[in-house]
Amino acid sequence: LEYERILEEALRDIGAEFDTETDLRAEGASRTPDVRLKVPISVCGRTIHWIDSKASFCDPQVHEESGSKQFRAYVNRFGSGMVIYWHGVVEELREVDPNVLLVDAFPERKDIVMLARFEEDGENEDF
């Protein structure tokens, strides 16, 4: 939970709106990432709809046994996303899945682009 709070605080700091895992479960979702972004962000050129936070190190065995299937379910339901393994990621895994960005820290502000939200009246609001 500590790392989830760090993630949520980082998202608030950049002005991102999001639903938490608790919010998603209240909507009836069973398998959920830690946050679903209400408006996607771009991180290093990749569109991110959801973020999961792991208080662990990711090596090929950990990724295959516990992450790979779980993240595919999130991609199928919510679109592409990002997983933060706070204790590191083996470099070879960072580009394994084009729909799941694996990182070891919340991205720096310079690597994040806030995407526009389109309002019902046709106007858009940049964040």
What do these predicted ranges mean?
Residues 48-49, 53-98:
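Catalytic cores of nucleic-acid endonucleases
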